[in-house]
Amino acid sequence: MKKLLAFFLFLFVMPLFAHHGRGATYDMKKQVTLKGVITEVSWRNPHVAIYMDVKDNDGKVVNWAFENSNVSTLARQGYNRNTLRAGQKITAVVNPSAQGTPRGLVVKVILADGKVVMSRESGANPVD
């Protein structure tokens, strides 16, 4: 009976850990810096998403998607849906997709005036 209970507990708990495992989705050992213009900010759970147009090496515009913390974590840190808006020029430092797709996990965002927002460097803003 204990083995059966442990098995079912394992089945329900493991997906929770899988959701927060970033290693398979993002290259956590690498950071890329991208400059561009925000096209959309999706301020909703489970994670705030930032979409940004970036010119690649050939001059072609590529729309990147960046995952950030959840709404309540960012709100506790003083950010809201007006912190970033479509049309803003920003620099995003991200852990890139492990699959090579134009996606990333936000390390920090730098506004046009040089102000750093939504940083998780040195544990300042851990992604939930």
Question: Where do the PLM segments sit?
Answer:
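Positively charged n-region of N-terminal signal peptides that target proteins for export
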Residues: 1-4
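Short aromatic-glycine-enriched beta-strand elements
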Residues: 44-54
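Structural detector for short beta-strands of small beta-barrel domains
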Residues: 30-46
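Short boundary/loop segments of OB/S1/cold-shock single-stranded nucleic-acid-binding domains
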Residues: 17-32
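OB-fold/S1-family single-stranded nucleic acid-binding modules
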Residues: 97-121
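Short nucleic-acid-contacting surface segments enriched for D/E, G, S/T with interspersed K/R
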Residues: 76-91
